Amino acid sequence: MYHLMLVCLGGAIGAGMRHLTVTAAGRALGTAFPWGTLAVNVAGSFAMGLLVEALARKFSVSNEIRLLLAPGMLGGFTTFSAFSLDVAVLWERGAQSAALAYVLASVAGSILALFVGLWLARSIL
């Protein structure tokens, strides 16, 4: 339960950071294009790569700190960072075909699922 609470705390911080970033980008660049979402996805993926490698090579931190930062804060900031890490892990393990299939299935499947959800909600409501 303690580990779950750490992930939740980090997630709350990350979600707040996401909101602030998306809001600031919308004010600065307009809302015709999702600049804020793009920014959090790219920045979150960069931060996930930096964090995972830094923790693995340079810094000895507890599992609790890892949970707070990676799935917690960065997961709340952007779930895209977790997806990007999954792709990188598959790729670096030599499973390039699986990594590419995962990218295609995730992107196409998520967009398709969104449209199915829209259709279902519009049909029911």
Curated annotation (Swiss-Prot):
Top-level taxon: Bacteria
This protein's GO CC annotations: plasma membrane
InterPro entries: FluC (IPR003691)
Pfam family, one: CRCB
GO biological process: cellular detoxification of fluoride
Coiled-coil regions listed: none
Subcellular location: Cell inner membrane
Topology class, membrane: Multi-pass membrane protein
Keyword Nucleus: no
Residue ranges crossing the lipid bilayer per the database entry: 4-24, 32-52, 67-87, 100-120
Molecular function GO labels: fluoride channel activity; metal ion binding
Activity regulation statement: Na(+) is not transported, but it plays an essential structural role and its presence is essential for fluoride channel function.
Function: Fluoride-specific ion channel. Important for reducing fluoride concentration in the cell, thus reducing its toxicity.
Protein name, entry field: Fluoride-specific ion channel FluC
